[in-house]
Amino acid sequence: MNNAIFPNKFKAALAAQQVQIGCWSALASPITTEVLGLAGFDWLVLDGEHAPNDVTTLIPQLMALKGSASAPVVRVPTNEPVIIKRMLDIGFYNFLIPFVETQEEAARAVASTRYPPEGIRGVSVSHRANMFGTVPDYFAQSNKNITIIVQIESQLGVDNVDAIAATEGVDGIFVGPSDLAAALSHLGNASHPDVQQTIQHIFARAKAHGKPCGILAPVEADARRYLEWGATFVAVGSDLGAFRASTQKLADTFKK
């Protein structure tokens, strides 16, 4: 089949601690998402938390990535089983779960993506993810091929990082630098030494549990530093940021 869904190559790459360079997709456009997919990134976050995305906007973007080597990762707006189920049914296999603070919340995210008895995912026999009922052994294969990445972006999450990283079914730990900075009383200043030290601590604890860690780092120097610290999957920019910067540069070239 074209763009075969199993095995999940992104999940395997994370398990093997292979560096994965990604990009954020926030414009909710299948055209810009397709352009990102052609650029050669290993993975793309289709953001459902801070971008204007929902089921109706995400399906065309998944279609736009069909045949691309870039793995689509959906950031859901919240750690809620029904929302996660809907993302599963439209064809996502890689999940970024925001604001996870405890082992119980991490386990809830994992359970939301697994069919019983391993989890609590609701059963539909025909949907986009199983190619409308044509994927053999979809139920068992799906349970084994879902990627769960949890975001740590609060002090409580930092305090519980060991328990979260040790949660069965969690494939990776992702740092939300902006929210983490705010939680540490450095709103708008993720480069503050306290924030950077905490990021390094999270990376170290994830590594101690054999879990890859990731982060969003649109500044090249930051991205390279995080890679040196052991980050495995790093989003190095966004479609919105690239578009804004390039159009501003173009306008400035002729208007100033």
From Swiss-Prot:
EC number in record: 4.1.2.20
Annotated site residue numbers, Increases basicity of active site His: D89
Keyword Magnesium: yes
GO molecular function: 2-dehydro-3-deoxyglucarate aldolase activity; magnesium ion binding
Reaction equation(s) it catalyzes: 5-dehydro-4-deoxy-D-glucarate = 2-hydroxy-3-oxopropanoate + pyruvate; 2-dehydro-3-deoxy-D-glucarate = 2-hydroxy-3-oxopropanoate + pyruvate
GO cellular component, one term: cytoplasm
Active site: H50
Protein residues bound to substrate: Q151, S178, D179
Pathway(s) per entry: Carbohydrate acid metabolism; galactarate degradation; D-glycerate from galactarate: step 2/3
GO process annotations (BP): D-glucarate catabolic process; galactarate catabolic process
Free-text comment on the cofactor: Binds 1 Mg(2+) ion per subunit.
Family, per entry: Belongs to the HpcH/HpaI aldolase family. KDGluc aldolase subfamily.
Entry function: Catalyzes the reversible retro-aldol cleavage of both 5-keto-4-deoxy-D-glucarate and 2-keto-3-deoxy-D-glucarate to pyruvate and tartronic semialdehyde.
Annotated protein name in UniProt: 5-keto-4-deoxy-D-glucarate aldolase
Provenance organism: Salmonella gallinarum (strain 287/91 / NCTC 13346)
